[in-house]
Regions:
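Catalytic pocket-lining loop regions of alpha/beta-barrel enzymes
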Residues: 203, 207-299, 309
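Divalent metal-coordination and catalytic microenvironments
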Residues: 41, 110, 142, 206, ...
Length: 375
């Protein structure tokens, strides 16, 4: 996998990366200044069956294969992976309706983290963007090993890097749709050799293109802090800049406040991307409620980490859509900002997290530095 240390980033590829002043969307590049209100971790069209394989028990198989209907919603909320249909976001008209609600509440951009092997549909995302006027930034790379297409096992880290660079610079083959972020690169409970290979390939692509990264770390694991530390060490070893990396799912137990601060101290962004999930993750542990997340965000702001916080919902299941009784993509704008204000978070702080920090993620022109200077 290589152990070389890179002290300097590669020269920028013209037109992309954090020095370009642009962000690639599924409809083409836009100025960073035009991002507007941005959710930095969502799924619009996806199929995350990798998170829930068919159960071995005959008694559970019927529920697993049943269409998601009102009579089983309660059961599915207790364990979202127990139903296969719940894990599919494939109805174009449905997701257009859901994304339109986000646009109605002032949302401008969504960073879409679905990857090859987990249901990425580049042309579908292009259609959603056309129909909703919401800017969509598509991801590149590979999620957790269980989702990897078979050919990934035969690839080297450099092969993976080349493929990601192609998606970023030329577009996904056969679609002409370009990716604008690397991720969400998946690390699961066991942090397998294949996942490390994928991570190193992604980091090398980030070094070559200077395009931001987003890294999935399993919530509910007692090893989350250990894994995040190891991930950041690998990224730095491969020459990726942590100042343009999101460490996802930091609010999910048992990630401590000390662990979150340690991530920010190394320069990375804190992905508060489970706002309003509203269900129990079963054996992986219960995510914090919005009240706890709001209090933690206020604590981080008071400790000086405002410019490291990004907000999102991580919508990836049908039960998270408003059509199935969920809160959808507009919940942060409709409700969670009120909870933040109740904790003393100012409107300027909210704008920083939803507008200015995404600009910092995608552009080196917006400085954090000592004291977190204003853009």
């Amino acid at each position: 996998m290589g152990n070389s240390m890179h002290s300097e980033p590669s020269p920028a590829i013209p037109g992309i990366g954090v020095h370009s002043g642009q962000v690639m969307t599924v409809l083409g590049p836009i100025p960073v200044e035009d991002l507007g209100v941005t959710l930095t971790h969502e799924h619009i069209l996806s199929d995350v069956g990798c998170n829930g394989p068919e159960p071995p028990e005959a008694s559970r198989k019927a529920l697993f294969h049943k269409p998601l209907t009102m009579d089983i919603l309660g059961e599915v909320r207790l364990l979202p992976q127990c139903n296969r249909d719940n894990q599919r976001l494939t109805d174009l008209d449905l997701v257009v309706s859901e994304v339109e609600k986000y646009c109605h509440w002032g949302g401008r951009t969504i960073v879409e983290m679905t990857l090859d092997g987990a249901g990425r549909v580049p042309l579908g995302l292009k259609m959603v963007s056309h129909r909703t006027d919401v800017q969509i930034v598509m991801g590149a790379g590979y999620y957790i090993e269980f989702s990897h297409p078979p050919h990934v096992r035969t690839m080297s880290a450099d092969d993976i890097a080349d493929e990601i660079v192609r998606d970023l610079t030329e577009g996904v083959p056969g679609t002409g749709v370009g990716a604008g972020i690397i991720g969400e690169i998946g690390i699961d409970m066991d942090f397998t050799a294949e996942e490390e290979k994928s991570l190193r390939g992604a980091a090398r692509a980030a070094r070559r293109t200077q395009v931001p990264m987003s890294i999935h770390v399993p919530g509910g694991s007692t090893r989350s802090h250990e894994y995040r530390t190891r991930i950041m060490d690998i990224l730095e070893e491969e020459g990726a800049s942590l100042e343009h990396v999101i460490m996802d799912h930091v609010q999910i137990h048992p990630t401590s406040m000390e662990s979150q601060m340690a991530i920010a101290e190394r320069g990375a962004f804190l992905g508060y991307d489970g706002i309003s999930s509203g269900f129990d993750w079963g054996e992986r542990g219960m995510g914090p409620g919005d009240e706890e997340s709001a209090a933690d965000i206020k604590h981080l702001i008071e400790a000086g980490y405002l410019h490291h916080i990004l907000l999102s919902h991580d919508v990836h299941l049908k039960i998270m859509l408003t059509a199935y009784g969920g809160w959808g993509y507009a919940y942060i704008l409709r409700q969670f900002v009120k909870r933040l204000r109740a904790h003393g978070v100012t409107d300027q702080d909210i704008t920083t997290m939803l507008v200015e920090n995404p600009k910092r993620l995608f552009s080196s022109r917006y400085q954090r530095g000592n004291g977190f200077g204003n853009p």
